[in-house]
Amino acid sequence: MEGRGSPDNRGIDYRHVYLDPFLIISEYSLIKIDMIILRNNERLMAEIDRIAEVAGYLWTKGWAERNGGNISVNLTTLLSEEEKALPALVSSIPLQEAMTALCGHVFYVTGTGKRMRYVAKDPFANGSLIRIAADGKSYDILAEQPIPPTSELPSHLLMHNFLRAKGRDNRVVLHTHPTDIIGMTHCKPFLDSEKITRTLWSMIPECRIIVPKGVGIVPYEIPGTLADRKSV
């Protein structure tokens, strides 16, 4: 290792090194240690594995063409206070609207432009953990790479925030493109909530159990826009 004040041949600048009685650790190494801490959380990694499994289903069934669809999962209850307080890779990315019911919450979110087949293979290379700020007005990217979340993050967070504010414990928002449902929406009669709901209930009896309040229909809006978020 070269002396302090000059970068070594691995690109680590030792001007940022601090001394510990037993260790010499660079800022780069600290980030790696944070990742090790998270990877050692068995409950967290089991949930990440389930996300990968679901992403695989979306891909194999053709319900997420190209980079279509996205996933966000609230992981807050699976993390220790130490893990929730890990330093950010990217800090204070502003949100258009304060998410007051999500302050301090941590989510796994698939990345912008990422494909489900790749999420299934490596969730952390195709998504990131984000932490909502204490005031709910911004978020940090925590791990494992500074991958920007899906462009539809505002819609996801608005749904999470709404449900949380209502005392609901729903932790997952999954946006997908089921082929048959999309086909039905191209037929004008099914653009009526009651019509499509009753049709689905009659075709699949279990649907009434899983979706007891029916299926909502919202007008078309450009994905990721404020209008899209509000309509959802």
Task: State each model region's role.
Residues 3-5, 11:
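Residue-identity detector for glycine
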Residues 6, 26-29:
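Serine residues within intrinsically disordered or low-complexity segments
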Residues 19, 29-33:
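Intrinsically disordered, low-complexity segments enriched in serine/proline and basic residues
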Residues 21-25:
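Hydrophobic alpha-helical signal peptides and transmembrane signal-/tail-anchor segments
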Residues 33-231:
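Glycine-rich flexible loops
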